[in-house]
Amino acid sequence: MSTEALEKMLAKGMDNALLRFGLGKGYLDASEFAKAAEHLQRCVEFDAQYSAAWKLLGQALNKQGLSAEARAAWQQGLRVAEEKGDKQAGKEISVFLKRLDKPAR
């Protein structure tokens, strides 16, 4: 579903974690990182156990140069993934955190 269609649903009063995740993912894919981060932040406010949303939130923040905020999102996402047994998200988030720790070349 397009971000336009999802935005229309939001404007009609639908607002939930899945809708916000869809918007965040759509905007992230479109390189609209600030909008992506806004929707993904709302997503994790709806559902703090949504490890995939924490992962994407970290990406959106990192793409804006907000590495400290990205690290915080990924660390929270890693905690959630480990608590839920979400091994795939945990592995992906661990890779992002390691990349963040590497010095820039």
Features from the language model and the residues they span:
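Structural marker of alpha-solenoid helical repeat scaffolds
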Residues: K12, F46, K63, V80-K84
